[in-house]
Amino acid sequence: MYSLARPFLFSLDAERAHALALRSIDTAYRTGTTALLARRPVPLPTPAFGLMFPNPVGLGAGLDKNGEHIDALFALGFGFVEIGTVTPRAQEGNPKPRMFRLPEYQAVINRMGFNNLGVDALVANVQRARRTGGLLGINIGKNKDTSNEEATSDYRYCMERVYPLADYITVNISSPNTAGLRELQEEQSLRRLISDLRETQEALSAQHGKRVPMLVKVAPDLNDRDIDAAARVLADLAVDGVIATNTTVTRTLVANHPLAAEAGGLSGAPLLGQSTLVLRRLRARLPESIPLIGVGGINSGADAVAKMAAGASLVQCYSGLVYRGPQLIGECVNAIRRRREAPSGGAVSPL
């Protein structure tokens, strides 16, 4: 079905096509025709962060920024859906156009800039959702006009608002589309921010009588020294998990494309190699008690297996859905299932 719709969607501006695709998924859900878009995968229960995921394939943050399509997305067969990034106050994001397809490379460049309706709107949407079929992650960020020195207050506010509703919370400090945000990944800044948020997490756990895991999402553009420093901080502070990775600002593999000079984060197939290297290095540097989610460049079941081989417990798709459609979900689940059933038992590949 998606192969028939794709030529029309690709004739539209990328952001307009994005909105239309979400409306179509909603329509299919309301009319009970989601099965025409994707066959729901057979469950593949997967433990991580003290939770049990129906299957290890999730939706990465950014597709449903405001939590307006949760039930329709679960109906496609995701084991978990991550909504956001959400900020304390609504913001429009960067000027349009701000999303670009690179079909020759099965890639996307975006500079959305955390456009969202604000955390209160997201909370209202989550409260209305039925949420059957999977676990819900909520990705939080800071407003663009909040300085890095004051960033903790934005993250804390969002965490307090979404904590009762989230199955896990992701702290996004790695988007390239908010000026200065990635500076929060520097060792001392990271330690201050995550230390404060761990204290908030523990206080909220006592207040609500449940512990919601807190994950940190990192960039693929960190050098080995920065990765090692981040791993030390995240291990010292005992975060619940790490998502590797966000989009990249490098253009090496798409340098000849006419859109390569567009500002923003590059995602899709060209990101697979670098994001998986970061994932593998983090797995080698972090204790086994901190699971990883692998994301970046997954366009096939084999790509998902590569993430698992590099040390991921779960994987997420986003740009791959633009090119492959919802069938990618089941393909990834089935490929991971075959890997689990293999005699090797799915050992992590060495550095």
Curated annotation (Swiss-Prot):
Localisation per UniProt entry: Cell membrane
GO CC annotation terms, alphabetical: cytoplasm; plasma membrane
Residues that hold FMN according to the record: A61, G62, L63, D64, K65, T85, N139, N172, K217, T245, G268, G297, Y318, S319
Pfam families noted in UniProt: DHO_dh
GO process annotations (BP): 'de novo' pyrimidine nucleobase biosynthetic process; 'de novo' UMP biosynthetic process
CDD domains: DHOD_2_like
Subunit structure: Monomer.
Family: Belongs to the dihydroorotate dehydrogenase family. Type 2 subfamily.
Role played: Catalyzes the conversion of dihydroorotate to orotate with quinone as electron acceptor.
Protein name: Dihydroorotate dehydrogenase (quinone)
